[in-house]
């Protein structure tokens, strides 16, 4: 939720943000009107209540002849106070509803436009070149007996898979590598719940335009999370945090679930776009004044992972119209996928400023002793999709895959992933 004071004092900023996103500006006008009605209703209620209290004192002091009249006036005022209180509550609810329809205010410099209007920040690394026809990740995975899409579909349906043998080991190694980097950077690891309450899912902004991508258990009224960001944001809901020693940082490891609604026909081959996957998510609670610096810190950690895995990648500043409702700015890190001849998103990091914290009631106490909403940020440090880039980038002509040096300690020192036929022949 955006700051109501910003809406009140600078509605032009909110309108400009909506225009950058290509979103409705009418909702801003509606929220401004609702805020005005709320303040008028509260003023009326407080005035009538003060009048009621004053009459109550007069009744206590009145002589016998005047008491019936004053009591009648008090009763009338009581009814008016009750009605005014109801109007104030209704106005408060209307404002809350209007405010929840306004996404976060984008940060200065975020490019305008939609999915294809991102700004390139940098390209890093040399794209893999081969003296043979490269295989895609699924063909490599089948040669290694590491990825089984057929049985995944048999057991669970389309966009499900098994990671088998070295495939399972590779994913666990990747996650442990990311976790080691998180610990090195001082993040506290958490294994998070994957089922959350509606108020937590709504508080993080995932029940807006993309609600159809979320799995819901109707009988229990719980949501399956598509990222541990949701649980990590809810972890300190309705709390006052102590940031005197600096930001509070977590690394959440969880299984994630996404419906991939609207993705029909996209990435149907392999494990680029699946319904279930593993993810290690960084999450920071910081003083809002430090949020942009923290965003750069998270991005630097992601880039270091890309470099240590030997992946060519680019960093883009996502356009406003392609941001989720909670994000004020989002950087995507996209790795080069040789067989697609394209960069594909492997990870992203978002600065949600105080948007989620306002919804979830997460505050911190400043130097002046007053409390105010914290800023929250998130970024992925490892996930299943990275296997795609690792297999394709480091493949060899015989179907084997060279293991990046940084990953070898997490695979028992293994230097090469060998085809299953070669292993069987030994």
Swiss-Prot record:
Q: Where in the cell is it found?
A: Cytoplasm
Q: State the disulfide connectivity.
A: none
Q: Which GO terms describe its biological process?
A: selenocysteine biosynthetic process; seryl-tRNA aminoacylation
Q: Which residues bind ATP?
A: 258-260, 274, 345-348
| EC numbers, comma separated | 6.1.1.11
Q: What class of enzyme is it?
A: ligase
Q: Which Gene3D superfamilies match?
A: Bira Bifunctional Protein, Domain 2, Serine-tRNA synthetase, tRNA binding domain
Supply the alphabetized keyword list: Aminoacyl-tRNA synthetase, ATP-binding, Cytoplasm, Ligase, Nucleotide-binding, Protein biosynthesis
What pathway or pathways are given for this protein in its record? Aminoacyl-tRNA biosynthesis; selenocysteinyl-tRNA(Sec) biosynthesis; L-seryl-tRNA(Sec) from L-serine and tRNA(Sec): step 1/1
Q: How does it assemble?
A: Homodimer. The tRNA molecule binds across the dimer.
Q: Domain description from the entry?
A: Consists of two distinct domains, a catalytic core and a N-terminal extension that is involved in tRNA binding.
**Official protein name in the record:** Serine--tRNA ligase
Q: Which organism is it from?
A: Clavibacter sepedonicus (Clavibacter michiganensis subsp. sepedonicus)
């Amino acid at each position: 939720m955006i700051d109501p004071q910003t809406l009140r004092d600078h509605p032009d900023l909110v309108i400009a943000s909506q225009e950058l996103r290509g979103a409705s500006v009418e909702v801003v006008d509606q929220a401004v009107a609702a805020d005005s009605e709320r303040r008028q209703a509260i003023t009326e209620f407080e005035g009538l209540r003060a009048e009621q209290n004053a009459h109550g004192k007069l009744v206590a002091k009145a002589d016998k002849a005047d008491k019936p009249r004053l009591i009648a006036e008090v009763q009338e005022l009581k009814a008016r106070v009750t009605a005014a209180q109801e109007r104030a509550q209704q106005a408060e609810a209307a404002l809350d509803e209007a405010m929840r329809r306004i996404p976060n205010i984008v940060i200065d410099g975020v490019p305008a436009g939609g999915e294809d209007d991102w700004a390139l920040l940098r390209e890093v690394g040399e794209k893999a070149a081969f003296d043979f026809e490269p295989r895609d990740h699924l063909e490599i995975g089948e040669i290694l007996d590491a990825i089984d899409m057929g049985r995944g579909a048999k057991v669970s349906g389309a966009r499900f898979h098994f990671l088998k043998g070295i495939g399972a080991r590779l994913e666990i190694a990747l996650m442990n590598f990311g976790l080691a980097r998180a610990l090195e950077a001082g993040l506290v690891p958490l294994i998070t719940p994957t089922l959350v309450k509606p108020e937590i899912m709504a508080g993080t902004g995932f029940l807006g335009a993309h609600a159809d991508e979320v799995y819901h258990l109707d009988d229990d009224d719980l949501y399956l999370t598509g990222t541990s960001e949701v649980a990590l944001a809810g972890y300190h809901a309705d709390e006052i945090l102590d940031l005197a020693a600096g930001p509070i940082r977590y690394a959440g490891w969880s299984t994630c679930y996404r419906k991939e609604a609207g993705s029909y026909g996209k990435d149907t081959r392999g494990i680029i776009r699946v319904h279930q996957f593993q993810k290690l998510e960084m999450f920071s609670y910081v003083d809002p004044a430090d949020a942009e610096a923290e965003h750069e810190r998270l991005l630097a950690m992601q880039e270091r992972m890309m470099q240590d895995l030997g992946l060519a990648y680019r960093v883009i500043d996502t356009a406003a119209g392609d941001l989720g409702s909670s994000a004020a700015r989002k950087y995507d890190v996209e790795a080069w996928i040789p067989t697609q001849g394209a960069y594909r998103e492997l990870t992203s990091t978002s600065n949600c400023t105080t948007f989620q914290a306002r919804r979830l009631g997460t505050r911190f106490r400043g130097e002046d002793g007053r409390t105010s909403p914290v800023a929250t940020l998130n970024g992925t440090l490892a996930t299943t999709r990275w296997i795609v880039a690792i297999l394709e980038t480091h493949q060899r002509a015989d179907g084997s895959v060279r293991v990046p040096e940084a990953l070898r300690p997490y695979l028992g020192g293994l230097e090469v992933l060998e085809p299953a036929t070669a292993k069987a022949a030994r």
